[in-house]
Structures are given as structure tokens and as C-alpha cells.
Amino acid sequence: MVNIKIKILFILCCSLLFSEVKINVIESNDDHVIVEYIVNDFTTNLVSYENEVYNEIILNDEPRFIEQNKPQLPHINRSFIIPDFSSISVEVLSSNYSEYKNMNIVPSKGNIKRNIDINDVPYLKGDTYNKNAFFPASLYEVKDPYILRDFRGQVVQLNPFQFNPVTNVMKVYNKVVLKLTFDGTNSQNQFYRTLTSQKKITKDYSYMYMERFLNYTNDYRYTPVSEEGEMIVICYDDFCDEMSDFVDWKNQKGIKTTLVPKSTAGNSANAIKDYIENFYDNNDLVYVLFVGDKDQIP
């Protein structure tokens, strides 16, 4: 019995350690990032529809293309911290792939709304299936930059699966090494910092950055971190007295908390939004709590 338990535990541990996708940051500095993508495995399911059998490709925890009537293939999206005024350019340093023949990749049904039963939507092949070319055509895509509180970021999308619907060949890139250089010219969402925007990185946001940005390195992690971010409680005026003990308790815990009557914050959704934005610009705001029913807080 002991041996059986040990074997079961070993199998469970191995399954937890194994990942279909492994990503390693080989080098990271102010000028560039070198990142290695490894696709260890993937899942193939057979889907039957109107006398045709399709291959459904699944890469655990990774999204798939949802362009209607185009091959529904997985891709890998990861974010990187970039400079405030430049963007990412990509160079493929190395790659290798395997080819799978006699494939028939299932077409995507598109981005289905929640009020529609996906089983009622048919599988339809679009014009892509008539072209003697691989889809997607590019091994990678670079999305527009965005700002997330303390940093400007950019998503690099790797397309390790490419399918030619005429030859029925699917390429799977098992290993790709990309060099991401911060000399791109995409000026979307440039980050103009002000003295008031130079916030300390709060603990909760630091955890978020670690999960989101592959190049959130020790240099960023050791930036001075405040104990906790601030909270504002926007409360329906008649309930403010009842919330005073809650606010006192939060302050005693070390979370600087400000109680704001709704009449002070504003009597419309836009006014309250402007109040929160102004508070955010001048404080280390992390938490917002609304107190009141939907008719009391617009």
C-alpha cells in the first residue's frame, strides 16, 4: 500500500511539473530581451461534422484564433515591459519545427456571444481554406503598446502552429528564440510621466506585474514598494456612519482608507469616474469600494 501511494504521488508531482509550453527569458536589459519558447506537447481531438472529420488543436492554458471560418489554431501571448516612448521590433534568432501531414484543422465559429448556444453554430470553411498558403502567415505578431499603472507594456504573440489547408500540412514550431529590441516606432500610448505619477509600486501591483510581464526583473522588483496601496470607500451618504468602524479598521491594518460620501464624489457616473481618476492621479490608489444599492450609486 505504501509503494502504491508513493507511485501515485510521484505521478501527480510529475504531471504538475510538466507544462506543454515553457518560456525562458535568456537575456534581459534596457535595450532588448531574448526569449525562448518551447512547445513540449499539444492535444489533438477529432471533431465530426456533416460527414467530415476535423482536427481540433489544443495547447493547454493558451488562447486560440477566433476569426470566424478560419483555422482555429492556438497561439501564445506574453507581455513585456517596454520604454515609455519606443516599442518592440522582433528578430527570429532560431527556430525548428515538425510537420504533420493529412491534417484538417477545424474552422473557428468566431467570437460567440453568451446568449447563443455554440452547438447551434455550424462549422464553415472560409476563403482561407482555398489558399495554398500557411495560416497564420507570420510566426509572430506584435500588438499595440498599452499602459498598466506603473509601466508601458506590449504583447508579443507567437504563432507556433501554422496550417496549409490545400496541402493539409500543419507546422508545429517546437522551439523558437526571439530577440525583442526596444527600437520600434509604434507611438501608441506613449507614457508621459509626471511628478505625481511617480508612485511607489504597491505590493498587490508588484504581484500582478510578476505574473504579467516576462521581463519584470529584479531591478523592478527591488523598486521601493509601499506596504499597501490606498483605498477609497464611496458611500451612499445615509450609510457613512455605519461604515466608520470599517474604515477605522482598514486604517489600523495599514491600508490608508478614505471615506467619501457619494454627494462629494458626484451625483452621476461620469462625475464619480472623474473623482476616482483625480484621486488616483494624486495618491497610491489600489482599491475602490462602493457602498449602496444600484439606485443609490449611479
Predicted regions and their residues:
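Extracellular pro-sequences of secreted precursors
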Residues: S19-F290
